Amino acid sequence: MPESTQQSHLSLDHEKMQQPPKGFTERSKTKPNLADFETYQKLYKQSIENPNEFFTQQAKENLDWFKPFDLARFPVDPKDDYKNGDLPAWFINGQLNACYNAVDRWAIKNPDKPAIIYEGDEPDQGRIITYGELLKQVSKLAQALTKLGVKKGDSVAVYLPMIPEAIVTLLAIVRIGAMHSVVFAGFSSASLRDRILDADSRIVITADESKRGGKTIETKKIVDDALKECPKVRNVIVFKRTGNSHVPFSPGRDLWWHDEMAKYGPYFPPVPVNSEDPLFLLYTSGSTGKPKGVQHNTAGYLLGAVLTTKYTFDVHEDDILFTAGDIGWITGHTYCVYGPLLAGATSVVFEGTPAYPNYSRYWEIVDKYKVNQFYVAPTALRLLKRAGTKYVEKYDLSSLRVLGSVGEPIAAEVWHWYNDNIGRGQAHIVDTYWQTESGSHLLTPLAGITPTKPGSASLPFFGVDPKILDPTTGEELPDNDVEGVLAIKSAWPSITRGIYNDYNRFIDTYLAPYANYYFSGDGAARDRDGFYWILGRVDDVVNVSGHRLSTAEIEAALIEHPIVGESAVVGYADELTGQAVAAYVSLKKDKAVGEDVENIKKEMILTVRKEIGPFAAPKMILLVDDLPKTRSGKIMRRILRKVLAGEEDQLGDISTLSNPGVVQQIIDVVHHAKK
């Protein structure tokens, strides 16, 4: 069982309850999707007590079906969800297509309406893609993929920057009933290789190069390096992002995007798929080190995406949603691609960073396109808060109605900065909690109706039945003013259908820790008003800039360095990124660093950058004589975390360690590193 959260965070609920901004309803051109808080309470109760009835109505209203479903979920009664490792099936016997729901129905209704607003890395680079044009582009690529032998159920690997062609790619893949497996374009060639092999992808779609923050990234070269060990990959489709003529190209295997698109006509019919057919794989970090291919299926995921987009953000067809998240992560999947397009809205796709060419970039985009909903990680907000309000003041942000936060809890002082300087007291902040595995929001305020507390994820979304469990006994803590681990009692439509090719691992990770519950991996509290607070991971995952990284994966990379004997990676608080990575490293017995210690540390960091990617690089390398272990050989990461947090007086009884004397040396090393 995970360790219990030691420090109580219930004092956080002293923050005054914030009511939704006055005039929220009047500032929308359209009537809100939910009338008031009482309506939420009524619908939420129905979604828990009678999920079949609730989700039947929602699925009929929000999705188009080629063949109507017979039953929203089976078994109808959620009391046996997760029993024996089983998950319910959703929308039994229904057939639909994700691309049709995201593109065709809106292209038919209004082909000239903008679907995607693209803002390039440079402020003068951008274009608008209408729903009609999007349908043509998606149809062309769908035909190209079909001609290359991609069929229903196959997986296609995607390694693209944040450009419109990335969205076209995802939609074309699901149009023909295949699965996309997007790999974040900041991952190393080794990480890309592992994901291509695990998903058994035979086609890769990429770009010649990428642009980010004024820098050029050799995207195609990374793909080529990965494919040296992926013999089953037949073809690579390459989009010309920069047009660099020196980019490596393998005739026969490699195909230029523009050549393939020119071969085909403007329409290709969507392939009907069953409700529970796979939609995509997205790899996330796991505590065992091997990345997990989280699988989402079609109908349940689509419904979760569209409902949360409409109700969390109050998105309407005439709205513009700017999600500042990459498609390499679940935030980009659900709230840059599927959510806004399923709702018939316009999605802003931003290639760059919040600091290039200066710290006003986000606000320039909001002003330029009159964005209505903005969704971002607290990491970016901390960076922009530190830069100062001078980068905000000259922009008109009055179009904003909703400000979202994602990836980690937002600190109260950042919440207030966001509210006062970006929302200017007129936009509603929704601090959302969810996971790659959940597909869509689990805990969140609903725009315009839910009171909020800075730092709290507020209340559950429809169909989500959260419980706080005692981490030791697994018993529910039913009252308010309690703290433990967060679990979900019954399944919701967009829950992952498992880990690709490894369902037992899914059971072991999420269902086995607490019988008859889905275990989130997070500590949580429910305050005296029933509001939920997320307290951080209780497993071996660190959260850096809103991205979950496996400590085991980083440790495995460090071991690749020739003098590293053992390593233990933990997260620690960082003002900018929320958490940063610290690596405790002990050297092989016959190795020493001498006076070259700083260069050796740099080499270790570079090893991680090469094996995983720059975002996973440790911020701190701590060379120690040994790691604290139990007599069975388990490394006590709890001790390492507490020493880093300055809580060496709270280590408890260390006499049971096999090597208790090493603890003082670790404390000394940490103190020296912090000087």
Curated annotation (Swiss-Prot):
Residues annotated to bind CoA? 212-215, 331, 545, 609
Kindly give the InterPro entries that the UniProt entry links to this protein.
Ac_CoA_lig, ACAS_N, AMP-bd_C, AMP-bd_C_sf, AMP-binding_CS, AMP-dep_synth/lig_dom, ANL_N_sf
Answer yes or no on keyword Nucleotide-binding: yes
UniProt GO BP? acetyl-CoA biosynthetic process; acetyl-CoA biosynthetic process from acetate
The answer to whether keyword Ribonucleoprotein applies is no
- Binding-site positions, ATP: 407-409, 431-436, 522, 537, 548
| Reaction catalysis annotation | acetate + ATP + CoA = acetyl-CoA + AMP + diphosphate
Q: Report the transmembrane regions from the record.
A: none
Per the UniProt record, which EC number(s) apply here? 6.2.1.1
Keyword set for this entry? ATP-binding, Ligase, Nucleotide-binding
The residue ranges flagged as biased composition, category Polar residues, are 1-10
Give the residue ranges for region: Disordered.
1-32
Give any Gene Ontology cellular component.
cytosol
EC category: ligase
- Entry GO MF terms: acetate-CoA ligase activity; AMP binding; ATP binding
Sequence similarity: Belongs to the ATP-dependent AMP-binding enzyme family.
Supply the PANTHER family for this chain. ACETYL-COENZYME A SYNTHETASE, ACETYL-COENZYME A SYNTHETASE 1
Q: What is the name attached to this protein's record?
A: Acetyl-coenzyme A synthetase 1
- Name the lineage: Eukaryota, Fungi, Dikarya, Ascomycota, Saccharomycotina
